[in-house]
Amino acid sequence: MTKGGLGIAAMSYVVIDYMRYVSPVWHSRLMPVLWSVLAIAVVTRVLFYKHWSKELRAAIPFLGSIVFLLCALLFEALCVRSVTAVLGLDWHRETPPLPDTGQWFLLALNESLPGTLVEILRAHIIGLHHFLMLFIMLGFSVVFDSVKAPGLGLGARYIFTMGVGRLLRAITFVSTILPSARPWCASARFNNVPSQPHRWAQKYYVPYANDPAAIRKLLHWDAAYADPGSYIGDYRADWGSMSFLSEFLRPSYSEGSSWFALLKKAGGGCNDLMYSGHMLVAVLTAMAWTEAYGGFSSAMIWLFVAHSAQREIRERHHYTVDCIVAIYVGILLWKMTGFIWSAERKTKQTKLEKIQNSLIHAAKDGDIETVRRLVEEIEVSSRVEKQSKVISNRTMTVFACATVITTLTIVILALTLTSDG
């Protein structure tokens, strides 16, 4: 896999997985073969992997990143339900989608492009689980020296960046509620949400929503002056110490037994807009692949990102602006988290280059003591690095086994839990 093998394996995975639509029989035959070959190759190389000490040092940041991402996803899930529930189902049924020039453009292309090309654009070639698996393949490729070790360091950067992105995304879409590009979405996914708006919306939004004169008065007085009438109350779930969430999630009597089960029930959101979570994952995978591996396969993954973006717009899962914002947010966030893991190789030569100017000035001034001190700093730094790598073989063996088992478990859970989007 060191010279193009990773790219071939990645493209083979995408092609074979797409065969489920073309030839389910061949898909069922080839996919187990591919996984078996990859698993055997990884297990074989793990026995000769030389960078377990680096992996051990990266384990704590990796675990911390997982905890951070889980917290971010929990906050996002709360916001996804709340942002739809606050206005009630009637608002979602009656409010038309926003005008989207990207959707118009794709419809126009359908009329002008050859039918075969349009079918390729419509095809479900790549999805969320594909991008996750492509990154997992990238992370495991450290055992083939295709990617700079530690793999857990690369994973920590990817997971932490995704957590930051999901947190920012939730804060963004909960700030201003946009109507879904699919008006039926709320009724299909949140059919037990009350039809009427929340009491906050009844007081601060409904009286002014369709009356320009009322909005002018609101701006002039800067106070909610309209009488909203009698509030229609909501069911209050008894969730113990978490009962305060009932105010935001607005559960019905039939679904109010557990707040956590309520969050898992929807299988996706409707008004979690402004930037796409699926596209964020796609862009982070492409950025990680480009920096860590590069080559022709990176260009292919960026093509997959573009295909995924146009399909998100075409199928009205998101507006065009959601995909565009996700692309540049993902790129910028990845650039900002290089302190966790970077493809740049820090060597003794790099350290020497950093103090080059100081050495030159000291040599010109004949300051032998300064020259000796700078050289000793390099030597001490190198010895510290070497000593930090000396860890008992037993510790490394236990850590290696635990890492492989834990990582494979995370892979299975990730693919299982994201199967519905």
Swiss-Prot record:
From the record, give the transmembrane residue ranges: 30-50, 60-80, 124-144, 158-178, 286-306, 323-343, 397-417
Gene that this sequence comes from: PLM
* Phenotype on disruption: Enhanced plasmodesmata-mediated symplastic transport through the phloem pole pericycle (PPP)-endodermis interface due to a defect in the formation of the endoplasmic reticulum (ER)-plasma membrane tethers during plasmodesmal morphogenesis and associated with pores lacking cytoplasmic sleeve.
What is the designated name of this protein? Protein PHLOEM UNLOADING MODULATOR
Query: Known InterPro entries for this protein?
Result: Sphingomyelin_synth-like, Sphingomyelin_synth-like_dom
GO BP term, pick one: sphingolipid biosynthetic process
GO molecular function terms listed in the Swiss-Prot or TrEMBL record: phosphotransferase activity, for other substituted phosphate groups
Membrane topology type, per the record? Answer: Multi-pass membrane protein
Ordered alphabetically, the record's keywords are: Lipid biosynthesis, Lipid metabolism, Membrane, Sphingolipid metabolism, Transferase, Transmembrane, Transmembrane helix
Q: What class of enzyme is it?
A: transferase
